[in-house]
């Protein structure tokens, strides 16, 4: 992203934090305290799901089949599962907290799982997280930005 004064910003998390500084509403990045660390924790869990999902997608889609690594794919699936389990354990807090970058990151990650790996049915093992996401996905900002294949 290039800012109004010509500076280049790289990486989604930096761009999101920059954009968050440009408005007067409630911050997506809480300034301090437990709520900040909670938001950043959820952001990292969501980003971790996305990172592992993209690595898995690249392996499945773009590498020649004879070069596929079952161990590599299994490692990415385990990474995703650990993050989903952690979020399942915290979903009651997530659902009661004001909107932060963590909510957005988790929502985007779960949407990506639906888009690219719907056959895995992440919801089956994470019913509370699935219920939270069903509500969160109805937000106008989420519903209008659902990726199309």
Each language-model region and where it sits:
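Long amphipathic alpha-helical segments
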Residues: 93, 145-149
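Hydrophobic/aromatic-lined pockets within catalytic cores
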Residues: 20-24, 58, 114, 118, ...
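GST-like fold's C-terminal all-alpha helical module
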Residues: 46-131
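C-terminal end-helix/capping segment
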Residues: 124-145
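GST-like domain detector, emphasizing the conserved glutathione-binding G-site
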Residues: 1-70
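Non-transmembrane alpha-helical segments in soluble domains
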Residues: 16, 20, 40-43, 84, ...
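Conserved residues at the C-terminal ends of beta-strands
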Residues: 4, 107, 148
């Amino acid at each position: 992203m290039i800012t109004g004064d010509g500076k280049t910003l790289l990486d989604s998390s930096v761009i999101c934090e920059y954009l968050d500084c440009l408005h007067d509403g409630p911050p997506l990045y809480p300034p301090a305290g437990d709520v900040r660390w909670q938001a950043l924790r959820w952001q990292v869990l969501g980003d971790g799901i996305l990172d592992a999902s993209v690595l898995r997608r690249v392996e499945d889609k773009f590498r020649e089949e004879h070069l596929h690594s079952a161990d590599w794919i299994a490692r990415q699936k385990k990474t995703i599962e650990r993050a989903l389990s952690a979020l399942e354990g915290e979903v009651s807090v997530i659902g009661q907290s004001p909107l932060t970058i963590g909510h957005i990151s988790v929502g985007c990650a779960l949407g990506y799982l639906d888009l690219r790996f719907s056959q895995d049915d992440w919801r089956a093992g994470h019913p509370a997280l699935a219920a939270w996401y069903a509500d969160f996905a109805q937000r106008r900002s989420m519903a209008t930005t659902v990726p199309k294949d």
